[in-house]
């Protein structure tokens, strides 16, 4: 019968078989009676195991004996067994001949501590697996939520950018209206009393004071904001493309609203930000070639206009649109003198000669790093070929978002960018870059550009223009102009060949842009920084 600690039927059955003479030729007691011997393991496996024990092989029977603490008797090494070569002898202290009463002491061994530990750790391991699965599921949920938050964040950024552009457009419209009112009132006063100095009326002065106070408050709370690298996500790229396209269409539909600098980029770089905001009133004055009386500068300098300072480009080493307060703003492009055009042509000719004389190797103190943003493969290959021949390191972006990401990484000496790009247009890219980088020159590659477009580009952070199609020499001259700090001393541009600022003022015929055969020409591509220009609206 089985005991409380394990069944002893196996032991009793084995003892009874040893008592029977039927199996003595296979299984018997030892001569001393304190052990038993399996004489023939093969016969034991074939005859006894299938009939009396539930074991299929002798090894399983031996394992069963070990569970009841039977041990195999090992003879001295090399000594033959007295019961034959294939005999197996097993012993247990309570398994002896004629001592059946001791069989109750033979119990099945308790599981080892190792097995017990394994059994105890199984539930723990299963519990840990469940916890890991729960953590993985929770992580997936967090990833989905984070992705949604990132998308929402990008959408909010674009909405904020659109709102900012809308506020800028509103401010420019307000400044244009105020400027028009000033001109209208000044014209009325001059018609009544031509020799009198213009003094704004009380309502107009209150309007000007209120606008200046509003401008001061906006400048005080405005600061450049970093554009994050999350724009590199492909999902946000599509959103950015559609949003910026709408934004660009807004700027195209209302070109008059972008005729003066108004972004945070320009405001943050003014010594007198309040005056800079107020100066929009004088810069947005509507001009007509047939009516010069609306322009106060044509009739002397009035105190109200003297405090409106021209907005300067934040990079003094790059191209800037200069305004000469002593020149007449009533002059239209059709009235530019032949002497002015000849002077601009002489500057371009002298610069072309100097550029041709400079070799394209050994130009730089170190290799300039250029970011080229161009989606057209043919133009990109040609420009890269030119730049590498000038010993420049070139990195390439093929769309607007890629350009923002690479510019955000920094380390570029100059950005050469086509303004017709996928995902983000060049103007939007420039506005984004200028919010955290005010110094790197940005050269716009463009063609068929109008005067309003050119002014818009400069007002929003573009340093200079490179008009298609351009030559290798033109590109080299523009690089030398914008990267003067990297030029070797013997390759520096000779400033004596360029008319001085004083001479330009005395001639009163400075030229920034002029039109030839309905196509804009840009002498400032060569070297126009020392020349102050009058921006005039053509007919």
Curated annotation (Swiss-Prot):
It comes from the Eukaryota. Residues 251-263 have a biased composition (Polar residues). SMART domains: HSF (SM00415), REC (SM00448). Keywords: DNA-binding, Nucleus, Phosphoprotein, Sensory transduction, Transcription, Transcription regulation. Gene3D superfamilies: 3.40.50.2300, Winged helix-like DNA-binding domain superfamily/Winged helix DNA-binding domain. GO terms for cellular component: chromatin; nucleus; RNA polymerase II transcription regulator complex. Residues 251-281 are annotated as: Disordered. The modification Phosphothreonine is found at residue 221. SUPFAM superfamilies: CheY-like, Winged helix' DNA-binding domain. One of its GO terms (biological process) is regulation of transcription by RNA polymerase II. The keyword Cell inner membrane does not apply. The modification Phosphoserine is found at residue 223. It is found in: Nucleus. Its main location: nucleus. Residues 369-483 form the Response regulatory domain. PROSITE patterns: HSF_DOMAIN, RESPONSE_REGULATORY. The modification 4-aspartylphosphate is found at residue 418. InterPro entries: CheY-like_superfamily, HSF_DNA-bd, Sig_transdc_resp-reg_receiver, Sig_transdc_resp-reg_Skn7, WH-like_DNA-bd_sf, WH_DNA-bd_sf. Involved in oxidative stress. Transcription factor that acts upon trr1 and ctt1. This is Transcription factor prr1. The gene is prr1.
